[in-house]
């Protein structure tokens, strides 16, 4: 039928008869199935009828379906709701599964894409909706053939596909690799596919990172499948590489085995070798190789690297001389112990060197019956060896240095070791002590450093004591005139084992004088509440009674006899007898009566009271009971330091709160030294001597005025040590007598 002059109403009648009136009854009852038929009628109208009649209008599917619903009597019942029916059809159409294929080339770098008929259509893989009761693979084959004209039934793999759901519609595309680039594609449908082309996967959007997204809208139907396609290609390439390696190894082995079999089976040489051209020159005869020789060569080549190595055979040494000649010009080499034996050096038996080697039974040995070296060569070899040895020995013989043979054994060499003294070793120094040896008389002789005697005091304490002793000695300046009494007094103080001398002083007077002076309670319990008393005590030190340079030192000697020998005293106090000058001295000191020199003493007292400022308090501590401490306490300054001597014996009151604040200013004696002295003196003293321990006086100096200092120095220039000593004793006795009263 020709539609060249047909009207639009005639065209609708023809389309209704073709696609709707002849449908089965069950499809006519379903709006969805009727809509599919209306879509087929629309395609026929656009593809064929309008091609014959250009005057017919081009309509869309929605408008075309509305006109057909109104024109066909079977569709009148849905004419009023045809809009709703068409919307239901579109929703149903998007839920129909779609099947297609992705066709790749041999390198899997390009794929086949198709473009719709309209200009606004984009690129996509060939695919289509599945029909009723149609399988997925059959639908994919059919759609690929309709859109591209390529039959992929023999290449499709049902297990290789990409399945996705886009907007509620399931899409499955089967991957078909290995399509040739020379394949000709042509669509089998009318006005559905406009282009079919190969596209490089690297040029597609989202397939490669960091690539500008150009023309993305044209590939919107391809983009969702690119990521899974890239993963599939990667896995496929890895699998192909492994299979290729296996195939290559198998092919190589097969070729090698086939060549080997061909060589073994051939009875002659290979026939493919080029035969020589005939020439006029005479040719050498060519030896014919049998098949056995070829096989032997092949086996030899195959087993060339696996042959066991034959053991190395040593040359026979049975022909060597048993006793090689020894030529020695040195007398030292003639000795058995010093001679050089090459066989012993090599670990061989000198008498039978050949017996030292293991005997190996060898066959086909051509050298067993022949000598390895002739006798002349052996003679020269041994002579050269001995010449070298003799040259070394000759060097030792020519020099004065002994040879290694003449050196003594290490056991006879003695090394003398010197141990230098250490920096921490200090020799102790004590009064009246002699240094003791490091070892006793029974100790063996040791050739080395002997340990020096180390002081029992701590390093800092012994050093302090040593500095104090040096400072005391350096501060003393002795005068040559009128100093005999002072020297005598110091010599008597330094003696420890002084025997009592016969004197006119009675024992009772010595006892009372020693008790008055040495009793610590008299010094500790004395309270000086009045300042005038303290001034009076200090003034007594500068009295005129001490100004006589010609005073007799007998009193000092007798007094020291009583002080140094307290064991001769008695506990009972008796009234002193006035039998000698010392008794009168004791009575005078005890009574505190004025002496003929009281006038000068009163003058000095007045001057001292005018010049005295503030009196500092002292701390009196009892440290030890030894007489040596008393000697250190009673040290009287010389004529060059009168003011210091006067200030040292100012006994003042010390409050309990200030005892902790007053720091000691004199160098304290070490406790260990005092203990040693105490042990020696306890053996000599009496048991009653326990309470007779002197106190150690800690003194704070006071500074008089400058003008008064000059006057005191002028007055004390002619004072002797005995005068100072007697003045000090007088002040102590007077203070004790006042305290007792």
From Swiss-Prot:
Pfam families with a match to the protein in the record: DCP2, NUDIX
GN (gene name): dcp2
The EC number(s) this enzyme carries: 3.-.-.-
CC terms in the record's Gene Ontology section: cytoplasm; cytoplasmic stress granule; cytosol; nucleus; P-body; RNA decapping complex
Names of required cofactors: Mn(2+)
Assembly and interaction partners: Component of the decapping complex composed of dcp1 and dcp2. Interacts with edc3. Interacts with pdc1; via N-terminus. Interacts with pdc2.
Subcellular location: Cytoplasm, P-body
Function per UniProt: Catalytic component of the decapping complex necessary for the degradation of mRNAs, both in normal mRNA turnover and in nonsense-mediated mRNA decay. Removes the 7-methyl guanine cap structure from mRNA molecules, yielding a 5'-phosphorylated mRNA fragment and 7m-GDP. Decapping is the major pathway of mRNA degradation in yeast. It occurs through deadenylation, decapping and subsequent 5' to 3' exonucleolytic decay of the transcript body.
Organism: Schizosaccharomyces pombe (strain 972 / ATCC 24843) (Fission yeast)
Family the UniProt entry places it in: Belongs to the Nudix hydrolase family. DCP2 subfamily.
Biased composition (Basic and acidic residues): 606-616, 681-690, 707-721
Alphabetical list of PANTHER family matching this protein: M7GPPPN-MRNA HYDROLASE
Keyword Nucleotide-binding belongs to the record: yes
Keyword entries, A-Z: ATP-binding, Cytoplasm, Hydrolase, Manganese, Metal-binding, mRNA processing, Nucleotide-binding, RNA-binding
Residues that, per the record, bind ATP: 167, 220
Spans annotated as Disordered: 268-289, 425-453, 525-552, 592-616, 654-721
Residues spanning the signal sequence: none
UniProt motif Nudix box: location: 128-149
GO molecular function: 5'-(N(7)-methyl 5'-triphosphoguanosine)-[mRNA] diphosphatase activity; 5'-(N(7)-methylguanosine 5'-triphospho)-[mRNA] hydrolase activity; ATP binding; magnesium ion binding; manganese ion binding; mRNA cap binding; single-stranded RNA binding
Consequence the record notes for mutating residue 19 to A: Decreases interaction with dcp1
Protein name: mRNA decapping complex subunit 2
Keyword DNA-binding recorded: no
Region (Interaction with pdc1): 1-243
SMART domains, per database record: DCP2
InterPro entries the UniProt entry points to: DCP2_BoxA, DCP2_BoxA_sf, Dcp2_NUDIX, NUDIX_hydrolase-like_dom_sf, NUDIX_hydrolase_CS, NUDIX_hydrolase_dom
Single GO BP term: mRNA processing
């Amino acid at each position: 039928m020709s539609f060249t002059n047909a009207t639009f109403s005639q065209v609708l009648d023809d389309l209704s008869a073709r696609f709707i009136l002849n449908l089965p009854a069950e499809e006519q009852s379903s709006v969805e199935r009727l809509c599919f038929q209306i879509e087929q009628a629309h395609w026929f109208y656009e593809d064929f009828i309008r091609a014959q009649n250009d005057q017919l209008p081009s309509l869309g599917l929605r408008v075309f379906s509305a006109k057909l619903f109104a024109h066909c009597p079977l569709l009148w019942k849905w004419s009023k709701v045809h809009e709703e029916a068409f919307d239901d059809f579109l929703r149903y159409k998007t839920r129909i599964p779609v099947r297609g294929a992705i066709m790749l080339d041999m390198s899997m770098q390009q794929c086949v894409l198709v473009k719709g008929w309209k200009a606004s259509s984009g690129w996509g893989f060939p695919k289509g909706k599945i029909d009723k009761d149609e399988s997925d693979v059959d639908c994919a084959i059919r759609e690929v053939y309709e859109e591209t004209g390529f039959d992929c039934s023999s290449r499709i793999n049902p297990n290789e596909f990409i399945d996705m759901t886009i907007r509620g519609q399931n899409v499955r595309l089967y991957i078909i690799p290995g399509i040739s680039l020379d394949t000709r594609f042509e669509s089998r449908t009318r006005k559905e596919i406009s282009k079919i082309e190969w596209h490089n996967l690297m040029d597609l959007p989202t397939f490669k990172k960091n690539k500008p997204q150009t023309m993305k809208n044209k590939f919107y139907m391809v983009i969702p499948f690119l990521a899974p396609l890239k993963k599939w290609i990667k896995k496929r390439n890895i699998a192909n590489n492994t299979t290729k390696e296996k195939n290559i190894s198998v092919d190589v082995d097969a070729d090698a085995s086939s060549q080997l079999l061909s060589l073994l089976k051939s009875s002659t040489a290979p026939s493919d070798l080029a035969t020589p051209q005939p020439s006029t020159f005479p040719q050498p005869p060519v030896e014919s190789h049998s098949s056995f020789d070829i096989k032997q060569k092949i086996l030899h080549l195959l087993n060339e690297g696996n042959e066991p190595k034959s053991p190395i055979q040593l040359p026979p040494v049975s022909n060597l001389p048993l006793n090689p000649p020894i030529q020695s010009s040195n007398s030292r080499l003639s000795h058995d112990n010093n001679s050089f034996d090459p066989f012993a050096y090599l670990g061989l038996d000198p008498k039978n060197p050949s017996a030292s080697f293991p005997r190996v039974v060898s066959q086909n040995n051509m050298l067993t019956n022949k000598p390895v070296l002739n006798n002349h060569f052996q003679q020269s070899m041994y002579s050269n060896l001995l010449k070298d040895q003799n040259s070394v020995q000759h060097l030792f013989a020519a020099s004065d240095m002994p040879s290694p043979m003449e050196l003594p054994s290490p056991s006879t060499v003695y090394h003398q070791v010197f141990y230098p003294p250490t920096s921490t070793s200090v020799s102790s120094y004590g009064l009246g002590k002699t240094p003791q040896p490091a070892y006793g008389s029974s100790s063996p002789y040791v050739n080395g450093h002997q340990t020096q005697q180390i002081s029992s005091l701590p390093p800092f304490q012994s050093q302090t004591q040593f500095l104090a002793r040096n400072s005391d000695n350096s501060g003393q300046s002795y005068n040559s005139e009128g100093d005999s009494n002072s020297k005598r007094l110091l010599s008597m103080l330094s003696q420890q084992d002084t025997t009592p001398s016969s004197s006119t002083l009675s024992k009772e007077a010595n006892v009372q004088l020693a008790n008055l002076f040495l009793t610590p309670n008299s010094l500790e319990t004395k309270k000086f509440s009045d300042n005038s008393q303290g001034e009076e005590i200090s003034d007594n030190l500068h009295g005129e009674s001490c100004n006589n340079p010609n005073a007799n030192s007998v009193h000092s000697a007798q007094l020291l006899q009583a002080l140094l020998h307290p064991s001769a005293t008695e506990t009972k106090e008796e009234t002193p007898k006035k039998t000698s000058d010392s008794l009168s001295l004791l009575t005078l000191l005890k009574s505190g009566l004025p002496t003929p020199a009281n006038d000068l003493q009163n003058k000095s007292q007045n001057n001292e009271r005018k010049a005295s400022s503030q009196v500092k308090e002292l701390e009196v501590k009892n440290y030890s009971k030894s007489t040596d401490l008393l000697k250190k306490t009673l040290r009287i300054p010389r004529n060059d330091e009168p003011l210091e001597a006067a200030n040292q014996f100012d006994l003042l009151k010390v409050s309990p709160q200030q005892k902790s604040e007053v720091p000691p200013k004199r160098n304290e004696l070490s406790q260990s030294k005092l203990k040693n002295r105490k042990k020696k003196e306890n053996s000599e003293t009496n048991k009653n001597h326990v309470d007779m321990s002197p106190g150690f006086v800690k003194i704070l100096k006071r500074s008089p005025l400058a003008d008064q200092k000059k006057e005191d120095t002028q007055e004390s220039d002619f004072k002797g040590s005995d005068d100072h000593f007697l003045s000090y004793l007088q002040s102590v006795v007077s203070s004790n007598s006042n305290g007792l009263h």
